[in-house]
Amino acid sequence: MKNKSTMIMGGALLLLVVIYFATSYNPREVSRGAEPLFAAPQPDIDRIEIVNPKKDDITLERRNSVWFITSPVEYKASQMSIEQMLSALMTTTVDGTISKREEARDKFDVGDTGIIFRAYAGDKKVLDAVLGKHSVELTHTYARLSDSNEISLWRGIFGRQIDRDVNGWRDKTVYSFNPDDIMSLTAKEGSVTRALTLNDTTWVYTENGKEKPIDQEKTRGLVNLIATLNTDAFGEGEDIPRVANNDYDVEVSFSVRNGDTHTFHVWVPEDEGSKRYLVRKVDGDVLFRFFVYRGSQLVIDYEKLKPDDTA
């Protein structure tokens, strides 16, 4: 009798467990296996439109194998940024559908707050999607096609790769030379002229014609910096009044092996709170912004070049 009672109680408990799981399990509305966003053959994308409600609306176009920003400004784009974006796009997989309910758009930022991404191959639109927030694990982006209510999981952090303003897409290259081709550098600041000249394989520093000792390794670091100079950021509205009258603080020039000379002007920070150096090529109109660490090196500061044991 005791064994029979135990069996009845065990059966009742098992039934309760089955009922619990049957009533509490809440599966996703739709689920399917991972599928590539672009099935073979993949499109040759040559134009991209990004509509970002929180930042700039961007148009990127490929011209003769080189990518450019064509709106809201005309400027060469960062080739690496676009190549990485396209690589991520072409390897993106759709890992399942989260919801088909229109009211779920706001929850996943694929409604009015989402980023619209359109891609073209020639005259054909190959993708028109709204990208939303990323998953907690940072492995997926919530997305939906613009003409659909179906909210899906895209594997990868693709949404974060396109969420940037126009300056985030710009090519940050200022100069691109082989450091070995730099023959001399000169900085003119008021009545003081600081110069670095390559004598065979040794750099020589002079200040108003007077030679001073320098650390060769530090000097080569400066030469490498200027030869392959990339900006930290681009000048913005608050910087424009500073350079409006072209009243720069330092003029820096460098010569290369073929005899050409390249010159840029530097505006040093007006106070400690500014912490930014502004740079513009003498024949250019683009204003570059450098933070203190690198900007202070551009003016050929002797204190940064002298040997460590020099007082």
Label each PLM-derived region with a short phrase.
Residues 1-311:
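A short-motif feature that recognizes glycine-rich, charge-decorated loops
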